[in-house]
A protein has these predicted regions:
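Extracellular "leader-to-stem" segments immediately downstream of a signal peptide or signal-anchor
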Residues: 1-10, 16-88, 92-95, 99-107, ...
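Short beta-strand segments enriched in hydrophobic/aromatic residues
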Residues: 86, 209, 398-399, 463, ...
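Extended, compositionally simple hydrophobic/Ser/Thr-rich segments
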Residues: 132, 148, 155-161, 170-171, ...
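A structural signal for leucine-rich repeat
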Residues: 244-246, 471, 493-496, 517-520
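Short, intrinsically disordered, low-complexity segments enriched in Ser/Thr and Pro
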Residues: 135, 499-525
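A structural signal for short secondary-structure junctions
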Residues: 198-200, 485, 496-497, 521-522
């Protein structure tokens, strides 16, 4: 329990007769966290519930896999690269009840049930305080409900989701903040239901919703709360979108629809644009950054191209500095350098990432620093002149001392023209000081783009320290899903920068500093869409937007769902 351990399922079929539960620790704070279930791929590792399994034949929903209940302490849980298959005559089965906090993911997973079997495929609504977390490359087939997202905390980001053949609803959201890109739904029932009488808020972009029965009276999207749409196609339904939030919404879309960009309500604001009404139709041209997909970096042959940091003198106890060992492993010519699980490495000082290495992987292990560590991605500096890999991935690693305050974050400096990917990592600060693209995924830390013209794409980023969280100085910054807590500006866009952020959650759980803006724009461009706040101490954000263009500064103290710069 709580050990950053990987449970590996080799290729095969694994029959289960009852719920697989995440481990219990000696104390509640040690339970159901830092546990990673890793398969060999959706075609190779299958967890199967046989037909008519007694444990799943009752009336109360029962999970095949359960990963823990509230509070928000389920750090780094993950389910990866496998299939969950529910056989016939299992009406109570829930494919996966998943919970993770700050950083954790469901990636490359298929959940399917036979006809008339199963309640929910992916259940993210069985307990409060789920998230922030990342779901990517998920397919759900069958079940009454494909996906369930509920409760008012802590936001969930999705990318590339396929829903098919649900019996009641494709997706049921109540209260939760959902940030979604790339939904494809083939269904006879509504693809999305965003339920009334809640704080539920959804952003949906780059999605296709296909109805399989055009004469069906159900809408493709049944929205009763707050939604933002961009590049969403709905076809095969009598009504594409039904907005019915007590006459506060903009109305319905009848027949097929292709929404270029719109909101369910009139809640688009701008400090410098004149809006006759608070809609995109009144906003004029709105420019978005092009979306780049995170590059897929080859794994190579572990027997020939991987290097274990222990073989180069690293200290697995963390009592002494292992930066020298990491540098030697990088310079060895290996394509992958790995930090074995179960160890706690200490890194102080500087390491240069150079030469053929293209992946530094923690195998879900942990590290820390006592005096500060900087990993520099540099070009042409290998001591033996070996060629640099075009892309470098740093992934599946926790800097545990930086989890709360951020004072001892491990700094990754991109000084290179090469691509940098940081994925499934906690406790890092990425500095963009070069020309190469930066990709952050399932990331808990902070980001600064310091070199004008450099670009970053972020998919689920969580920022937990006080002070400025993300700073974009003249770069191009794209975000899908951001959660921030503690006081301090969420995003600064400065000196010609361009920020395009969709899905932002502010958890102002420590109050707010009155003169500190949540978002600061100076002689730059920003599109901020899908902004939500949760506050339970009666001291919410008091200054939302400060924008300076030329010599003029304007502020907005009230919240907005969408904010457009000049």
């Amino acid at each position: 329990p709580n050990g950053n351990r990987v449970i590996y399922l080799p290729p095969g079929e694994y029959e289960v007769s009852n719920t697989l539960r995440w481990p219990i620790g000696a104390e509640e704070g040690e339970s159901q966290k830092r546990t990673i279930l890793q398969g060999a791929g959706v075609l190779h590792s299958v967890i199967r519930v046989p037909d008519g399994t007694s444990a799943f034949s009752g009336r109360e929903p029962k999970a095949v896999i359960w990963t823990g209940a509230m509070p928000a302490n389920r750090l780094r849980n993950a389910v990866r690269d496998l299939k969950i298959a529910v056989g016939a005559e299992n009406p109570a089965a829930v494919g996966l009840q998943f919970n993770a906090s700050n950083q954790g993911c469901v990636r490359n997973v298929v959940i399917e049930a036979e006809a008339d079997s199963g309640v929910t495929g992916l259940d993210l609504g069985y307990t409060d305080e789920i998230g922030s977390l990342f779901v990517q490359n998920l397919a759900v087939k069958g079940f009454e409900y494909g996906i369930s997202t509920k409760w008012p905390l802590n936001s969930i980001t999705f990318e590339n989701v396929v829903l098919r053949d649900q019996r009641r609803l494709g997706w049921w959201n109540y209260h939760q903040m959902v940030f979604l890109r790339g939904l494809v739904s083939y269904n006879w029932v509504p693809a999305i239901y965003n339920e009334r009488d809640s704080w539920g808020a959804m952003t949906v972009m780059d999605s296709q919703i296909i109805g399989l029965e055009p004469n069906n009276a159900d809408p493709g999207i049944a929205n009763q709360r707050q939604m933002y749409y961009r590049n969403v196609e709905v076809a095969g339904y009598n009504r594409a979108i039904e907005n019915s939030d007590r006459n506060r919404s903009q109305g319905n879309w009848i027949g097929a629809a292709h929404l270029i960009e719109d909101t369910s309500h009139r809640n688009v604001v701008s400090q410098f644009r004149h809006l006759d009404e608070s809609t995109f139709a009144a906003a004029g041209e709105v420019r978005h950054l092009p979306v780049k997909e995170t590059p897929i970096v080859p794994w190579g042959d572990p027997n020939l191209e991987w290097a274990n940091i222990l073989d180069f003198g690293a200290d697995a106890t963390g009592e002494t500095n292992s930066s020298g060992a990491l540098q030697r492993a990088i310079d060895s010519g290996a394509h992958t350098v790995y930090l074995p699980g179960g160890a706690r490495f200490r890194f102080d000082g500087e390491v240069q990432i150079r030469g053929p290495v293209r992946r530094i992987i923690g195998l879900e292990g942990s590290c820390h620093s006592e005096s500060g560590a900087t990993w520099r991605l540099v070009d042409g500096q290998h001591p033996e002149g070996l060629e640099d890999a075009p892309e470098v991935v740093i992934e599946r690693l926790e800097n545990w001392k930086a989890l709360r305050g951020g004072e001892l974050e491990l700094v990754v400096q991109s000084e290179s023209a090469r691509t940098l990917v940081v994925s499934s990592a906690i406790g890092f600060r990425v500095l963009g000081m070069g020309r190469g693209d930066i990709f952050l995924e399932d990331y808990c830390g902070h980001l600064e783009l310091q070199n004008p013209g450099q670009s970053a794409w972020c998919r689920q980023i969580t920022c937990r320290r006080k002070g400025s969280k993300i700073r974009n100085c003249g770069g191009n910054l794209w975000i899908l899903g951001m959660r921030a807590e503690r006081t301090g500006t969420l995003i600064e866009t400065l000196d010609g920068g361009v920020t395009d952020a969709t899905g932002i959650f502010v958890y102002s759980n420590q109050g707010w500093v009155d003169e500190e803006p949540a978002f600061f724009i100076r002689n730059s461009s920003a599109v901020l869409s899908g902004i939500s706040e949760r506050n339970f101490n009666r001291r919410p954000v008091s200054l939302w937007f400060r924008e300076t263009q030329g010599g003029e500064t304007r502020e907005l103290k009230s919240p907005a769902w969408v904010d457009l710069s000049k």
